[in-house]
Amino acid sequence: MKTFVLFVILLCLTFLSISKSETCPFSQSLVSGASATYYTDPNAGNCGYENLMGPLGPGNLFIAALGPNLYNNGKNCGQCFNISSPYTNRSVVIMATDSCPDSGYCQRSSHFDLSTQAFDVLGAQSIGVLEGLTYYKVPCGVNGNVKIMMKDGSNDYWTAFLIYNSKVTIKDVSVKITGKSTYTSLTQSSYNYWISPNMVPGSFDVRIESVGGEFIYITIPKVESRKQYETSSQFSVDGCVGTPSGPSGGLGSPSTGASIGTPSDASSLTLYALFSLTILFLVMLN
């Protein structure tokens, strides 16, 4: 009997440990009362991805320009959202690639100015403004690892970095230049580039931190205008619901994971652990 009890205890501890580690790096709370309009030329958005079908973009046109509150000075560039509509009872996954600074609807706390491709999933264009939408954040199902590009005009003494192809948004970018032993955090601009004004000739290290606190490192041999590099890693999205997959990165289609309101994998494991503890308690009573 003692052996069985010990086995159950170890099982519970194992599942509780797994549950604790598998947490989504951002809040997935369901937000209601959102609205949406549409615009017809989504390329060259404020997040710096240029042509959406090009090497910096998501590879499709299911995108949105965010109002100032959601855009948050560029901090939500590259964030993906699952938006649901009462007009069609459908949802669509989009990536934030632009800002919507116009007065009016864009000034609302939760407003999306969508591409026509995304808008059409949620309602007819003749409606004009969609009201009563709900949304939550989801990881972007990008292919490959996180990438980095140095801005046009970069030189040995100044550069700026665009971080793209990430499943989650970026919290911080730091640089360790030649001859230094510590990293220096950079400032993110409202157009989504991280500015590094104190470079020197030679190689340097870049440290990229996700909103979940994970780090990716890359060594770059020299500053070179518009030079692109792929890192060796991608950020984890364990514990997130609605993680999209596939060649399109899940954009334009409903999320493939659990719906909001159902347990994520981590929550399910927690419930399983509690169930195991209940069994342990019953065994000890006997």
Curated annotation (Swiss-Prot):
Signal peptide: 1-21
Disulfide cross-links: 47-77, 80-140
Cited CDD domains: DPBB_EXP_N-like
Membrane spanning stretches: 266-286
Record SUPFAM superfamilies: Barwin-like endoglucanases, PHL pollen allergen
Keywords: Disulfide bond, Glycoprotein, Membrane, Signal, Transmembrane, Transmembrane helix
PROSITE patterns hit by this protein: EXPANSIN_EG45
Residues with glycosylation annotation: 82, 89
Main location as per UniProt: membrane
Source organism superkingdom: Eukaryota
Function: May serve to lubricate the movement of the cellulose microfibrils during cell growth and wall extension and/or they may serve to maintain the fluid state of the slug cell wall.
Protein family membership: Belongs to the expansin family. Expansin A subfamily.
NCBIfam families: expansin_EXLX1
UniProt protein name: Expansin-like protein 1
The organism of origin for this protein: Dictyostelium discoideum
